[in-house]
Amino acid sequence: MKKLTIVAAVLAACSATAAMAQASGEGPWLVRARAVHLDMANRDGTGLGLLVNNKTIPEVDVSYFFTPNIAAELVLTVPQKQTVSLGGAPIGTFKHLPPSLLLQYHFTGLDGYKPYVGAGVNYTKITSVNLLDGGATLDDHSWGGALQVGMDIPLDKNWSLNFDIKKVYIRSDVFLGTANQGALKLDPVLVGVGLGYRF
C-alpha cells in the first residue's frame, strides 16, 4: 500500500508539472537537431604529447519541460571516430559515444529570446580502439560533468533557431601494454547551431 501511495504521488507531481508547462501555451517536449563543432582541450597527462582531432558532428537532443523554466535535456549523437596523433603523425583511432543528461533553467519574458543554462552528467563509452597497431589502448568509459549555455529564438509557434555551447569533461587513461601512462583529458567545448521543434 505504501508503494502504491508513493507511485501515485510521483505520478501526481509529474502531471502537475506537465500542466504548468502546458499552461504557458507551449507543449512540454522540445526536440532539436544541431551541427556541433567538437573542440578538444587535449590536456595530456601522459607526457607523450598525444592529440585527438577536432571535428564537426551531428547531435540530437530531447528536452522535457517540467515548468516553463525548468527542463531536463538528453543529448545524443552517433558513435564518433577520432584520430589520435603523436608528434603530428597519426598513431590510430578510437570511437566514442558521449550522451549527456542536463538539468536546465530557461529564462522567460525576454521579448522572444529564450536563453538557458544547464548542468549535468556525461557518460562516454569508448570502443574500437586501434592505437600503435594494438600496442596501446584506452579506458573503455568515462564519467564527467557537463555545463551548458544557449539560446532559442522562436521562428513561429513550434519552430525555433538554437545556439548552444557545452563544456563536457571526458578523460581516459592511456595504457602501453599493461602500463598506465596517465590520463588524456579531452574535455571538449561543443559549439552548436540547429533547429528545435516544441510540441
Where are these regions (language model features)?
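Cleavable N-terminal export/targeting peptides
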Residues: 1-27
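Gram-negative (and chloroplast) outer-membrane scaffold detector with strong preference
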Residues: 37, 61-131, 188-199
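Outer-envelope beta-barrel architecture signal
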Residues: 4, 25-29, 68-70, 111-115, ...
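Hydrophobic alpha-helical segments of small multi-pass membrane proteins
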Residues: 99-103, 118-123, 140-151, 165-167
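Subset of outer-membrane beta-barrel
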Residues: 52-54, 142-144, 152-154, 158-162, ...
